[in-house]
Regions:
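Bacterial N-terminal signal peptides
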Residues: 1-2
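Exported/periplasmic ABC-transporter solute-binding proteins
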Residues: 5-54, 61-64, 68-76, 81-86, ...
Length: 241
């Protein structure tokens, strides 16, 4: 079929999708024979690149505002579709003096008693999972006190590496990464209450000029086969599409 004759479309996906979308893409390839090129990074960096004309075909953001801004700039075919709602939590590596505590009570105590040297979050300037971590720390009244201890990851996947490598005492990462066996085995994880931050409304959109294979994958993400994988990685499925 003509689908298979094309070069694989490029998907720019937020780093929280690293494990989930690799699995969805593998199933899509098995079901359709169509290959995809997956590129992972922070939603904000991809937004800037697409604005400057980067050759991406499907943009899967962790924050819907970036999608709306691209749509307003005339870069997309429409305003896209909500595909998942993400969650954040605290991960502490084995051997850390911190406890995995989603309400930051132990983190607050550790700031006072000197147990905390370094704590990882994604850069809130361009990584939505970092922006939500900042909101949660603000909610807990710890944002100012924790400033000197923060180590910023370029995206949430690098943040997960920082938080589990032993170079920090822990960090705030995506539930979807904590659910991956390769990350889960590195430490203990606790969800942060969802009311402590703005919801991580994850929206995807086709970029103007996207080939049919990109649209096929866009539609595939809404199928039960794909959603079953997303749910396994801790994503909530949006009510409105």
């Amino acid at each position: 079929s003509p689908l298979h004759a094309q070069t694989p479309p490029t998907v720019a996906a937020a780093s929280d999708l690293k494990f989930a979308i690799e699995e969805v893409a593998a199933r899509f390839e098995r079901d359709t024979g169509q290959k995809l090129r997956l590129v992972f990074g922070s939603s904000g960096n991809f937004y800037s690149q697409i604005l400057q004309g980067a050759p991406f075909h499907l943009y899967m953001s962790a924050d819907e505002d970036f999608v709306f801004k691209l749509a307003d700039a005339g870069k997309t075919v429409d305003r896209g579709r909500l595909y998942a709602v993400g969650r954040i939590g605290v991960i502490v590596p084995h051997g850390s003096p911190l406890k995995a505590d989603g309400e930051f009570k132990d983190l607050a105590a550790a700031l006072k008693d000197g147990r905390l040297q370094k704590f990882a979050i994604a850069n809130p300037e361009h990584a939505p999972y970092g922006a939500r971590a900042k909101e949660a720390l603000q909610h807990a009244g710890l944002w100012d006190a924790i400033q000197p201890k923060l180590v910023l990851g370029e995206n949430i996947s690098q943040t997960a590496q920082f938080a589990t490598s032993g170079s920090t005492q822990g960090g705030v990462i995506a539930l979807s990464l904590a659910k991956a066996p390769s990350v889960a085995k590195l430490g203990a994880f606790a969800l942060i209450p969802e009311g402590w931050h703005q919801p991580l409304k994850q929206r995807m959109v086709l970029i103007k000029g996207a080939p049919p294979a990109a649209r096929a994958f866009y539609e595939y993400i809404a199928t039960p086969a794909a959603q079953e994988i997303m749910v396994r990685y801790g994503f909530a499925m949006p009510k409105e599409q």
